[in-house]
Amino acid sequence: MLAVLLALGLALRVAAIVPYAMGPNTYSDDNGYLTSGITFARTGYIAYADPGLQTTAIGPGMPLLLGGLIALVGADPAGLVAAHIVFSCIGLLTAIAAYLLGALLCSRVAGLIAAGLCVLEPALLSVNIVFLTETPYMCLNLFAIYFLLASVREWRWGRYWAGVLCMCGAAFFKGLGLLALVAPAALLLRRRENLRPWLLRACAALAAFVLLFIPWWVRNGVLTGEFVPFTANRGDIQLMGSYIGFGYPEGTYEEAVLQSDREAWEQGYQDDMERRFARRGEMGKERLWQWFTENPLAFVASHLLYKPLALTVSHLRTVDLMPDRLMALVWWGCLALAAWGLLCPRLGGCARSGYYAPAVYLLVATLVTAVYAPLPRYGVSHVPIWLVYSGAGLQDLGGRALRLLRGKDEIH
């Protein structure tokens, strides 16, 4: 059954890609990542939108991944279509991870439903077919959570190292990948296990992480003279986030951008995009501090309630696969099923050890991600975990419906 779902997912993704002569492109961040891949394949340098400018604005993950694909299939139109298809298959690996996690926490049926939802959910399909970091990140992140939870449930070095390497791989795309540790930590605390053996294991994981990232840190230090662990903050998201929520200081994001651009021209650094984005970050921090000091209750409510909720209910559409309202309706339905999946174990539903550990991760990751701007693109990384609970919820509802029908048949 899982193979059938994966075949269906591949067919849908290929059908969504091939109408575009060079593969779908939103001419936004994905275009910058494509440029970074082509640049890395040809020069070995990590750049972004400008092929001639090395940068720390993105992590090494996308240049390495896309650079490898471009080196294999080329950058001509047919090669780009092939690269999109191969890239979208990573989304199908995410469905496999959802199946494994659902089976680990609930049942194989719940895992199959979760995998099917990952294959069919419009936002995930929409993201999988374009070159965005979210596709490889959420795949590696979900596998990391699965392997780390499995190693806590039944210790094996192989599982543990698989989880650690997947987590480090996710961090190559987004530094938030390290938050995967929250899930096994929650399970360890819940089970009140002796943590001494885990100190040695944690040290081994830390050593592996440092060894993997040392080349990146050295490269960034030589390039910028600073320690940049993952990526340099581009600043515009910080500024944008200071205009989202309750009771924030007056003004608009567009006005602030115009002001920062005017300063850049007046002070002669209009061609230095890194410095211009850094200035926006400074303006964002100033506004956030002003917001906190002038209206602390609104600031706290915005960051603990409004932004996380906005991040959760939003959905991302990169290309026109279906009407936006229909995509929103599908996502709301998945969230409703996930809510029931989180509740049903308290009402006699199926749940195995560690069932709520990914939910703890989801809470922490949502709060951290929503600190700045709760953009739909940032929320899509959490969709597969929501769908794992959606699968559990749908299985539980189906089981209750079957029992109800059988009860009626026995009465008659």
Please provide the spans of the model-predicted regions.
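Transmembrane-helix motifs of polytopic, lipid-linked glycan transferases
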Residues: 7, 85-106, 139, 143, ...
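Membrane-proximal lumenal/periplasmic loop motifs of glycosylation machinery
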Residues: 18-31, 42-67, 290-291, 295-299
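Loop-to-helix entry region of an early transmembrane alpha helix in multi-pass inner-membrane enzymes
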Residues: 56, 60, 64, 74-93, ...
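Transmembrane-helix signature of polytopic, membrane-embedded enzymes
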Residues: 81, 95-120, 139, 160-162, ...
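Short acidic/glycine- and proline-prone juxtamembrane loop motifs at membrane-interface regions
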Residues: 123, 129-137
